[in-house]
Amino acid sequence: MGLFHSIFSLPSTINDSIEKQIYMPPYIPRFYYESLNTNYSKIFTRTSSNGDDIPIVQIRPKNNPFPQKYIVFSHGNGCDVYSVFSYLTNLSDKLDVGIITYDYVGYGLSRDNIPTEQGCYDSIEVAVDFLLNDYGLDPKNIYLFGQSLGTGITIDYAHKNNWNSPIILVSPYKSICTVVVDSCIVRPIDKFCTLNKIYQIKCPVKIFHGENDNVINITHGKKIYDSLNDKSLEPVWIPNTGHNDILDKITIQQIREVIDYFD
């Protein structure tokens, strides 16, 4: 499902190279997105603090038009809202919860803009504010769910907003550069520095990582778990699983453990 792609070389123009490798939005014809407007889902657009239009897709379970709980799903770097829609629709029905997914600046219907780290952070702010302000949802009923690149975006939001509800991280990383090389040489220009923020997060965190992940090594997930303040949710290290097939290996029961944490 369009996930985080590794950085294979670090040339002299290292910053430009990192930017190009981080953001790899798929090209999907604009009219395809019209199919995301259904009886159970709808596309909205909201504007970020920097004036960028952020596409948001709201998905409701077929048997529950007014769900009390919502997941905010932050996708990987090779995905957009269209490519994750089928997975999230199925997840919504099985969990009986609403789901919000959104595109980062430079992705999907926002593709005319240039993707940046700050643009990603602005985008999740818009998505969560949509639930808080438009729907008046209590933060305790919102669950952040990040995959690959989206884990760093999720952690940044939780860190800045003193988040208390449980969050889900699938294939998390310490930082972008350490996916390839754990060296102080590249740290001055590093991006999405998850490990630097995880120490200050107080909420429960559920981590999933494939033992055969050859894009983001499982040592990243284990280091993130070791650094958590709240270890009340056991991590799941999934055998015979890589980077691109992990979502299909996570069970509904494992995700429900997070959604029902406060029940």
UniProtKB/Swiss-Prot annotation:
SUPFAM superfamilies: alpha/beta-Hydrolases. It comes from the Viruses. Keywords: Hydrolase, Lipoprotein, Myristate. One of its GO terms (molecular function) is hydrolase activity. The keyword Hydrolase applies. Pfam families: Hydrolase_4. A lipid is attached at G2 (N-myristoyl glycine). Its EC number is 3.-.-.-. Belongs to the AB hydrolase superfamily. This is Putative alpha/beta hydrolase L404. The lineage of its organism: Viruses, Varidnaviria, Bamfordvirae, Nucleocytoviricota, Megaviricetes.
